[in-house]
Swiss-Prot record:
GO terms for cellular component: cytoplasm. This is 3-phosphoshikimate 1-carboxyvinyltransferase. The lineage of its organism: Bacteria, Bacillati, Bacillota, Bacilli, Lactobacillales. Keywords: Amino-acid biosynthesis, Aromatic amino acid biosynthesis, Cytoplasm, Transferase. It catalyses: 3-phosphoshikimate + phosphoenolpyruvate = 5-O-(1-carboxyvinyl)-3-phosphoshikimate + phosphate. Phosphoenolpyruvate binds at residues 20, 92, 120, 168, 343, 385. It comes from the Bacteria. The keyword Membrane does not apply. Its EC number is 2.5.1.19. It comes from Streptococcus pneumoniae serotype 19F (strain G54). The active site is at residue 312.
Amino acid sequence: MKLKTNIRHLHGSIRVPGDKSISHRSIIFGSLAEGETKVYDILRGEDVLSTMQVFRDLGVEIEDKDGVITVQGVGMAGLKAPQNALNMGNSGTSIRLISGVLAGADFEVEMFGDDSLSKRPMDRVTLPLKKMGVSISGQTERDLPPLRLKGTKNLRPIHYELPIASAQVKSALMFAALQAKGESVIIEKEYTRNHTEDMLQQFGGHLSVDGKKITVQGPQKLTGQKVVVPGDISSAAFWLVAGLIAPNSRLVLQNVGINETRTGIIDVIRAMGGKLEITEIDPVAKSATLIVESSDLKGTEICGALIPRLIDELPIIALLATQAQGVTVIKDAEELKVKETDRIQVVADALNSMGADITPTADGMIIKGKSALHGARVNTFGDHRIGMMTAIAALLVADGEVELDRAEAINTSYPSFFDDLESLIHG
């Protein structure tokens, strides 16, 4: 696919699609609750559609009509054995969270995904689930998919310290803990996105959070709710960066989720001197309007507790850093290696091929700016965030063409991405 290059400005206002993390969880909680759940503004990307189909395969009635998703919850014990193996597509969120959901189901399932998912380690979630009494195994010692799982009605509670910062593992264990008899304690290594904690309480569940310690008493019952999904800050991130680095630009992004566990990119933009305004804050929905303008940027250091708050935004932040004066250092981000691709290497290779100066490290990157970018051919390797990062980088290219291979990967999280890009180019 040939990308737009050498644009003179970006202007306009858009609403980014619904938050992917919240969209997944709204389907999961709605399925496990008793009664009806209605979900508004859900993301209809391929990952979330995979989660919806899996729960249909598990016997849940899910209707998509007039822009609203209606889930007829079956309760914690109401899932039924599927006729066939469960297809998780490209979605690491789906396979990990649903492993926890099925921990208390007294039937056997096989879960598989596409080529990318089949390379992602699942031992981080299979190990603690085994401690709870679940029979679960995959391929090689890292438990790569496909996974075979047989849950148990006699699920044991767990006291577990996460060896990595992972909202997916935390959430899988919380879903399992809701079905175990007794008190489970999950201790995070670093604070990660807390959508599961928030939504558990929204659906009538109970937990206590004391710093990084989460305590869940099981078993519990949940009740169907109305869920309004805010815009995804991980999708908004591409426009935030585009507005900062494109010339003569001003972008308004409406209804963006600003949950404090997800706003690391806002902290980075401010540290780099970017012009960013936050208005129309809705404290209940945890959403706001974000406004960015073309800015002179400086390098910064991104590490430690900040990393889990922007892990999915690091590819586009790397592009931002190529347009900042000085050096930007990203470290403590080894988790990038086990995303849809090895994002440390793939981001460095993609942007370096366009003229950037990025040195990959064991746990991040060293990025020297400011770089003039030129044409190149870039492969997404099936990674949606690499595709969108490259499309934004192409906007700055004055010399040559940018070809993007496997651009369809973008449909994973943002099917309307190129439509929104066109509207901003012509805004």
